[in-house]
Regions:
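Alpha-helical transmembrane segments and membrane-interface helix-loop junctions
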Residues: 1-179
Length: 179
């Protein structure tokens, strides 16, 4: 179990770093958005590249923020049945849901989005707007984000198996109370 927990810790550490970058991107996206608006109104100047950069940052936040949010156990969940279960039952439900729904869905979506990225990469797809950005890097974020979420799912399954066997303790409840 120790080697598996080491893998889980490595995945968690990677997603912590991704989460840190995503947190910085929130600030950067706000600054770019505010600067864009001020320049547009103060100088009557607008750049498609800066506008596209805003939605590139938002796409990165959404796709990579999902794995960080899952690591922190802050995804939305319907707790009607979950709260009625014992802690062990909650661990089992988390593990089964992750194994049979989350991981297969993420891997399928990564697989299906890969050709979308490859086509853009192979043709060197550019924005249709004057001064716009190249498109293939942001299209890579789609399969990469799903792979990272699937990897975090693997980490969560490892932790739950370890908890069920008594190697670790996991607080299966939300980090914050239900709002």
């Amino acid at each position: 179990m120790r080697p598996l927990l080491a893998v889980s810790n490595a995945i968690d550490a990677l997603n912590e770093k991704i989460g840190y970058v995503c947190n910085l991107l929130v600030l950067l996206a706000c600054l770019v958005s505010a600067a864009n608006a001020m320049i547009r109104y103060a100088f009557s100047y607008s750049s498609n590249g800066w506008l596209e950069l805003q939605w590139y940052m938002f796409a990165i936040l959404v796709m990579f923020g999902a794995s960080y949010t899952f690591k922190r156990n802050e995804h939305v969940r319907v707790e009607i049945m979950y709260l009625m279960l014992s802690e062990r039952g909650q661990l089992w439900l988390d593990m089964i849901g992750t194994l049979f729904f989350l991981i297969p869905s993420c891997l399928l979506l990564a697989y299906l989005s890969w050709p979308f990225f490859m086509q853009a990469y192979n043709v060197g797809e550019m924005s249709g707007n004057a001064g716009g950005l190249i498109r293939w890097p942001i299209k890579f974020v789609i399969p990469a984000g799903f792979v990272m979420l699937a990897l975090q799912g693997v980490s969560e399954v490892i932790k739950r198996i370890a908890a069920l066997q008594g190697y670790v303790t996991i607080d299966a409840k939300y980090e914050r109370p239900t709002q």
